[in-house]
Amino acid sequence: MSSTNEQDIPQAEVAAPDGTETDNLAIIARQAIVDANRAVYGYELFDRSTASDSHTAASDAALLFNALSYAGTEALVGKKTVFINCTHESLAGGHLELIHPDKVVLEVPPLADSATAEEIEARVATLDALRTRGFRLAFDQHVLKRSYVSWLPLAGFIKLDMQAFKPELAGPLVKFAGMHSQATLIAEKVETPEQYQLMADLGVKLFQGYWFAKPSLVKATT
């Protein structure tokens, strides 16, 4: 299996209506999430606009939500599932009201390392409400820590960052996730064939990283 070049991923462009200011044109990158046959399951979106003086996680999340509400998921990713990096502030805000949840996965970050058990538990109500509305939630490997046990049943996806742990820990992480959740596992930041083979042999079905596809650009009006 060989990696997929950026040019191999079809680019999409959502044309701005006549009279639309270029300041409202968002440059969004999408990176494919694929199965073992390199069939695209979905795309993770990233803000790549340069108009703003600075980017923060919150501003990037707001821009992506606005682009989705304006253009719709199909214009940005076709009929595939879209994965969006969120902040906890954006999850509690009104950005999600105009987005149809069926094809949207919200990537929820862990709290700061200093977060208490009570602070982690306090997020459950918001996360559960999003699931009730039809959104699926994705967490990274932090959700497998004991302190996040209350989040684990809410996971639709767990993303295992191949750059964040040693190869010998892959097996225990995959086994623990399979025993304690119903989540679909995604190996992300897969950059070598060895990393892919390691996770595929452990039963992981979805993959993301430069070994498969680099991000490609999508233009959308916000």
Language-model-detected regions and their locations in the chain:
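N-terminal start-of-chain detector that recognizes signal peptides
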Residues: 13-20, 53-58, 76-80, 129-133
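Catalytic core of bacterial c-di-GMP phosphodiesterases, primarily the EAL and HD-GYP domains
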Residues: 61-129, 135-140, 144-147
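A short, polar/charged loop-to-alpha-helix boundary motif
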Residues: 49-66
